[in-house]
Amino acid sequence: MKKKDKHELKPEEFCPIRQTLKTLGKRWTILIIKEAYYSKSQRISFMDLRRRLVNASAKVLSERLKDMVEEGLMRRNVHGTSTPVRVYYSLTEKGKDACRIIEDLKKYGLKWRVKETFNCENMDCELCAKKKEKALQSSLS
């Protein structure tokens, strides 16, 4: 009987879903893509991400952005020659392709997860969030 090499790859390691989740399944990655995609100019600064993703620590957010640039999901753009320079992140084609997954997640959430009556099906996420916030504030008044 032939002994298996401990470094031999298992068939499930070739699974495209598993390979995709190694990148997109990391915490905050999908939400960073969503924020960049729905930002007005389709570029976003680190500080804008910090304001929008309040539960993400600066360290984790920085690490995730670095990973996403290395993976080819985002492009890091430095503007200005004097300090402080401005750094913006924008989606690459690979990153924009992931937005289809976000739309599918939204559809799934609307069908199976969202327990409220607020309907954001035909809105982009940025507009939806603003409308929900406005509705919440008026209900508290």
Segments and roles (model prediction):
Residues 1-7, 12, 41, 75, ...:
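C-terminal regulatory/oligomerization modules of transcriptional regulators
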Residues 24-27, 92-96:
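Alpha-helical hinge/cap motifs
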Residues 2, 69-90:
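Beta-hairpin "wing" of winged helix-turn-helix
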Residues 15-60:
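N-terminal helix-turn-helix DNA-binding core of bacterial DNA-binding proteins
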